[in-house]
Amino acid sequence: EVFDIETTGFSPVNNRIIEIGAVKVSGGEIVDRFSTFVNPDVPIPFEIEKLTSIRDEDVMDSPQIDVILPQFLQFCEGCIMVAHNASFDMSFIMENCRRLGYPQEFTYVDTVGISRVLLKNQSKHTLDAVAKTLGISLENHHRAVDDAECTAHIFVKFIKMLEEQDLSLIHI
């Protein structure tokens, strides 16, 4: 299960999730999607609105995280979670799990770490830079489900590259 979140800032303690997007991958294909806005109950900062194009009006009528998180966790149940720069996304998921009393035990993979191993000569390992290097389309960057879908395609390509090099994720 590959996922991405958009937030009101960089601190999982002080900032809020405003969008969660996720896709399930099976046999190298996307087989299911989860996408929702989250009402952060605080105004979205201007810089975040500029980056994501998500406005207060977009999230105003959406459920808050206490409703969305259990749905997201159910979507992820039994899956290894994959994200680009996973420590950021996971810190928000784990903080919200802590706040709402959900278990915080997750198995996750970070495509940035794999990128640093497989694309050694690349100077930037941002989602858009890696996508460009691998020839993967990234539409609506900084929208959660689109970033998750792009990350899924990157992850599938990385798995193929690892198999070709006779490596596995265990060695990374």
How would you label these PLM feature ranges?
Residues 1-107, 120-142:
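Conserved non-catalytic scaffold segment of RNase H-like nuclease domains
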Residues 7-9, 113, 150:
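Short, glycine/acidic-enriched loop or turn micro-motifs at the edges of active sites
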Residues 106-115:
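A short, structured active-site edge motif that brings together acidic residues
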Residues 143-156:
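Acidic, divalent-metal-coordinating active-site segment for phosphoryl/phosphodiester hydrolysis
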Residues 170-172:
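Conserved small/polar residues in nucleotide/adenosyl-binding loops
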